[in-house]
Amino acid sequence: MSGFSSEERAAPFTLEYRVFLKNEKGQYISPFHDVPIYADKDVFHMVVEVPRWSNAKMEIATKDPLNPIKQDVKKGKLRYVANLFPYKGYIWNYGAIPQTWEDPGHSDKHTGCCGDNDPIDVCEIGSKVCARGEIIRVKVLGILAMIDEGETDWKVIAINVDDPDAANYKDISDVERLKPGYLEATVDWFRRYKVPDGKPENEFAFNAEFKNKDFAVDIIKSTHDYWKALVTKKTDGKGISCMNTTVSESPFKCDPDAAKAIVDALPPPCESACSLPTDVDKWFHQQKN
């Protein structure tokens, strides 16, 4: 068990919905800043934002105090990822590695593009469909360099260490061997997922080639260094909330009572979710180039 738990506020699929994280003492913490990057030697923590097969685009709210998970909004509307045939929603458990940050003020030496201003993204390829707000331990296997509207947006490929088959996966080549077609589908998904919304296809560095585990770990470590600079105020976060309860060298550290006051001011937990819009289940068919 991770020792972490989550608490929902307001109803899912509403503008007010939030998922807050708690530590083993039941105190509110930030999933961005307070969950350690490492769970063990060579094992990373992952914050699950979007369970596999679901469509609601949930993400860590980097600019909100305590950085709860909330549904992304564009032009006042809640965002849902389209079902681009033959896919249904997200094709992995999707989330982020805590205590990382892709610095928008730093041009990546591999891509020539600056970071996307978020924690580094993870696609978890195990068999279990995880829960929104769940903290899992993952083994990193490789990484894909996506370029999203001119920004570097790394996609880490990882597997839950508790997956029954985790021991069989040591590097990205094992994914190619044991899950044939999955990496190709991953590139295809990321390339085209914004097309139904009228956006162009995304691009990739390295001709959309996945880099191996060692390369991926180096990238993650670099984003951890950028996060350290952010949370210790050596870098200007320009609106990012660095409020945390555990980072001793951070000027943004607060006590548990201050964190609790943030959550207590919000709508209470809600027993019933709002229903998903009916068009969320629609198929989109696109002629591939």
Swiss-Prot record:
Binding-site positions, Mg(2+) 2: 121
Citing just one GO molecular function, the answer is: magnesium ion binding
Where does the record place the modification N-acetylserine?
2
Report keywords, A-Z: Acetylation, Cytoplasm, Hydrolase, Magnesium, Metal-binding, Phosphoprotein
* Residues modified as Phosphoserine: 250
GO CC, one annotated term:
cytoplasm
* Entry-linked SUPFAM superfamilies: Inorganic pyrophosphatase
Q: What is its EC number?
A: 3.6.1.1
Pfam families associated with the record: Pyrophosphatase
Modification type N6-acetyllysine: residues: 57, 228
EC top class named in words = hydrolase
Q: Kindly give the InterPro entries that the UniProt entry links to this protein.
A: Pyrophosphatase (IPR008162), Pyrophosphatase_sf (IPR036649)
Cofactor(s) required for function per UniProt: Mg(2+)
Q: Which reaction does it catalyse?
A: diphosphate + H2O = 2 phosphate + H(+)
Give its localization: Cytoplasm
How does this polypeptide assemble, per the annotation?
Homodimer.
Family, according to the entry, reads as follows: Belongs to the PPase family.
List the protein's name: Inorganic pyrophosphatase
